Amino acid sequence: MQVPTKATWPRPYVPRLSARLNYLVHHLLTPNRVNRMVARWLERHRRAGQAFTAAEKAVKERAFGCRMCGQCALPATGYACPQTCPKQLRNGPCGGVSPDGACEVFPEMRCVWVVAYERAEASGHLDDLSLLQRPIDHRLAGSSSWVNYWQGRDEGLWADPDDVRTRLPIWPTTTRSAA
């Protein structure tokens, strides 16, 4: 495993498009019968799936600084990608955020979670920031988060912290054999 240096760390990123517009697009792309059929087709046709994933990466990288984690948290973070946080924190800021909202690692940049708060508040989705996110499944890195979303691989990605009965699944729902 390559040890990240300051040059290779993720850098906080301010998205280019309004959160309100992104919530609208996300609503249009929610899982439905057609999207699931498209996802299944993309998974069966390797080259088409690779082209779709490359297009998704190009768009989301420019728009959000996307790191292609395969488990997109954008709808729960005001469309500010938590993977652009140098510490890749998915459930809120670290303790090093300065009073003016600067990132601890890159002080010349705004903390991605400050940006997420401002964007969620401006678009009326502040409650989304209280959703707890399960740890990222690194096996999905580089895969299409849209295909994963349409195929239901993101189910249980977020949980309401007030529901103490909610258990965040870390492992896939398929049974694992005992070691």
Model-inferred region functions:
Residues 2-3, 10-14, 23-26, 33-34, ...:
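Metallocofactor- and cofactor-centric catalytic cores in central/energy metabolism, strongly enriched
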